[in-house]
From Swiss-Prot:
Keywords: Disulfide bond, Signal, Storage protein, VLDL. Induction: By steroids (estrogen). GO terms for biological process: lipid metabolic process. Residues 1-24 form the signal peptide. Belongs to the apovitellenin family. The keyword Translocase does not apply. This is Apovitellenin-1. Homodimer; disulfide-linked. Protein component of the very low density lipoprotein (VLDL) of egg-laying females. Potent lipoprotein lipase inhibitor, preventing the loss of triglycerides from VLDL on their way from the liver to the growing oocytes. GO terms for cellular component: chylomicron; very-low-density lipoprotein particle. Produced by the liver, secreted into the blood and then sequestred by receptor mediated endocytosis into growing oocytes. Pfam families: Apo-VLDL-II. GO terms for molecular function: enzyme inhibitor activity; nutrient reservoir activity. The lineage of its organism: Eukaryota, Metazoa, Chordata, Craniata, Vertebrata.
Length: 106
């Protein structure tokens, strides 16, 4: 039982999500820049599958996912991925401008 709980906690920490926020997000929303949409959806599917098999284990997952540690990790990941996304967009813009000016001569 202890190994099962450790595995469940590891999965929750890996996915870094809270279940109520998962249901409000869409995987195929092209305007979103949040890279955590896919792990959130995976966490929702895992929660739903576990909850169907054992509501008690599902409640345990829900309780663990709403702890301050998991929320803190998730907020950190959201902030860092947002920063990385912004940097990647700036890099792509610079590459595009470089191609236009140096390669195509615009």
């Amino acid at each position: 039982m202890v190994q099962y709980r450790a595995l469940v906690i590891a999965v929750i920490l890996l996915l870094s999500t809270t279940v109520p926020e998962v249901h409000s997000k869409s995987i195929i929303d092209r305007e979103r820049r949040d890279w955590l949409v896919i792990p959130d959806a995976a966490a929702a599917y895992i929660y739903e599958a576990v909850n169907k098999v054992s509501p008690r284990a599902g409640q345990f997952l829900l309780d663990v996912s709403q702890t301050t540690v998991v929320s803190g990790i998730r907020n950190f990941l959201i902030n860092e991925t947002a920063r990385l996304t912004k940097l990647a967009e700036q890099l792509m813009e610079k590459i595009k401008n470089l191609c236009y000016t140096k390669v195509l001569g615009y």
